[in-house]
Amino acid sequence: MWFSWNNTEQSIAVRQGYQVLAEYQLIEQEQLKNIYAIPSYASALHWFGVIFIHSGFYAGSMFRFSIILPDNFPNGTSLPTIIFTTTCYHPHIRPQTQSLDLAPFFTGWRKDHYHVWHLLKYIQAIFADPEGSISTTVTPSGDRVCLEEAYNMDALAMLSNDRVAFIKKVQELALFTKKHMYDKPTSNDPHYIVIEPFCSERHTKIMEQLKSPSWKEATSMDTSPPAQCLARIDSSRQMDEEEAKQSAKLFAKNGKAAAALQ
């Protein structure tokens, strides 16, 4: 009996592993700019993520975050948990825990409707258009009607009533994230996203390796996952335009922003 139960658990774990791998492949297909996420080596349900912001109120910021998928993912309706490991000041991020409120745009998880990449686009959108993220509707005169409650009421009030003060505060945090961008990794997980200063010589060497037949042959076999993800920081106009394009239509003027995630 024990053997049978153990086999069942193994079968469920293997199936879930393939489903999570499919989620990661979907992210690659979406080709999102300036945001990266990868399952940790220790657990397929714990993802590491990082976002670089090049425009808007949060320009110059770099935020790390974790995505915790429910134990029964992708089944069930429980939403994943997103926790920022870099301090963020935003109406939708709880200051005590740095957890992100998904409720404004996700009423519940539906595996046939949502994927992990939707979470990443949502993260991009709240930073690209923080004012749009707290707007419930727009009046005929063009005025925004803001939420009455949010995870961070102080940030909500400041963004609604004093944009200049809000921008100043988040820009102070942006400088802090720049200062600590290359800090020593806080996790020894092989899949932790390591950020290093751009080195043209190293970049050229890696690109040549990727083009070599031996590299293509080695990576065509699913024997072992990559040990590191190296993110190149590029603040060029092209990346800014791509980032803006990703989130421009996410928040609809009529307040039904969730439709943009479909």
UniProtKB/Swiss-Prot annotation:
This is Protein crossbronx-like. Residues 15-179 form the UBC core domain. Belongs to the ubiquitin-conjugating enzyme family. FTS subfamily. Pfam families: UQ_con. InterPro entries: UBQ-conjugat_E2_core, UBQ-conjugating_enzyme/RWD.
